[in-house]
Amino acid sequence: MNLGRTVRAAVARVVPDIPDDVLIFVNVHGLELTDDDLFSDRCALAPFASRVVLEITERIGLDTVGGPARVAMLRQCGYRIAVDDLGAGYAALGALATLEPEIVKLDMSLIRGLDLHATKRRVVGAIATLCRELGSRVIAEGVETQAELAAVRELGVDLIQGYLLARPARELAFVLTC
């Protein structure tokens, strides 16, 4: 819990320096859903909740921590929800039905070589279609080549993340140079 609180406090310190129309994505471990601080006005991110997307990876059974009810409470606080790493070993389609995320981030294992593998293309296309029907936007993680970019665009993915766009940067370096 302390690590999560520390991360949230660090993010909150830099939010005022980020343009108002930029969403801030913050990873939240499933166990953090048991931390009442996350749901309170005392949470460092509370003043910025409307700009924050909490990325949840289903690495533990969310039902064991009251996940769906807790996620509903986060929405009441103003946060948006993303299912992170969909397609990785633990992030299952059940998370889409249970959490009803505003955003779905496709794991890079589905994106790497997407342009070369017909089965991956069918899977990503089907997920993108399903997400659109459910009202979720889709982000492709790990886009590293122009060919992968062309493939995800063709398949209806909304946004990309990966080395093709930018390398990981410290705090605001990327945001402030775009």
Task: Show which residues each predicted segment covers.
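Active-site acidic short loop of glycosyltransferases
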Residues: A49, Q76, P101
